[in-house]
Each structure stands twice: as C-alpha cells, then as structure tokens.
UniProtKB/Swiss-Prot annotation:
The protein's name in its UniProt record: Ribosome maturation factor RimP
Provenance organism: Polynucleobacter asymbioticus (strain DSM 18221 / CIP 109841 / QLW-P1DMWA-1)
Lineage: Bacteria, Pseudomonadati, Pseudomonadota, Betaproteobacteria, Burkholderiales
Family of the protein in this entry: Belongs to the RimP family.
UniProt subcellular location: Cytoplasm
Keyword Cytoplasm included in the entry's annotation: yes
Keyword entries, A-Z: Cytoplasm, Ribosome biogenesis
Length: 163
C-alpha cells in the first residue's frame, strides 16, 4: 500500500494517474499509467518519462525492484476502482468474483454502474447484465470487495468507421 501511494504521488507530479501496480517474478515491477483526462492516449514518450522519474524516486523511497516496466492500460484495461466501474458503465467486461455466485465465478456482461450506496463507500453495489445458463438476461449485483478482477472486453473494428 505504501508503494502504491508513493508511486501514485510521483505520477501525479508528472501529470499521470496510476491504474495498477503488479509485482512479477525476477523483481519485475510493472506500473500501468493513464492520463487523468482520459482523452489523450499514453505514448512511448510518456512511458519513458515516467520510467526515468521512477528509476530515481524508487531507490530513494526504498521500494525494491530489479526491472521496471511502464505501460498503458491497453484495450483490455483493468477496471479497479469505484470510479472506474462508474466510468465504464455500458461497456462489456469480463468479471471474476472471489467467491462463486450461483455456481459461477466468471461473468461476461455489460456494466450497469452504481446500483445502491455511495460511490466510494464499502457498501456500494454495482450491477452487471449477463446471459444466464438458460439464455435469459440476468443481473449480478456485487460490491468491489467481492471482485477478484475485472477487465474491459476489447472492441476491435477491422472494417473501419462507417460514415
């Protein structure tokens, strides 16, 4: 948690927002960033700028790493915070629960956003419309504490835009 706060503060000073931090084998520290306005995409130059800053800041803060990787969230970006679940309302996601609900942990459906409670409160409930085993549309109601991981389902159009 301390690492996340320090890295988030460094990114904020550079004008970026932290999406997630992952630690992998071999000392890899993967930091995923985005622009706070969500309009401008992350470029290689953005990743280079952040990498340069963090390669100096992390040793000063005694945050261990052997290799540092900076990246954008990508097409299948993780959906982590309450604000993300609200922001991506209406989008298709793959959602995995920590504990099975109705004999299922994995769901693919459309986010319904905040259903009840305050956005950043622990009792906030979000919704997901998905196709049930019988083919009928069902709704899953969940809190962030129940979610193991969620990612956007990439939408790729190989035919190009239609006018």
């Amino acid at each position: 948690m301390r690492d996340q706060q320090i890295i988030a503060a460094e990114l904020e000073n550079l004008g970026y927002t932290l999406v997630e931090i992952e630690r992998e084998a071999g000392g890899l520290l993967r930091v995923t960033i985005e622009n706070p306005d969500y309009e401008r995409l992350i470029s290689v130059l953005d990743c280079e700028k952040v990498s340069h800053q963090l390669s100096y800041a992390l040793p000063v803060e005694n945050i261990p790493y052997e290799r540092l990787e900076i990246s954008s969230p990508g097409l299948d970006r993780p959906v982590k915070s309450a604000a993300d679940f609200e922001r991506f309302t209406g989008m298709e996601v793959d959602l995995k629960l920590r504990v099975a609900a109705g004999n299922r942990k994995n769901f693919r459906g459309v986010l319904q956003g905040l259903l009840s409670g305050e956005l950043n409160s622990p009792d906030a409930k979000f919704g997901l419309l998905f196709e049930g085993a019988d083919g009928a549309e069902s709704q899953l109601e969940f809190s962030l504490a129940e979610v193991d991981k969620t990612r956007l389902v990439p939408v790729i159009d190989f035919k190009g835009r239609k006018s």
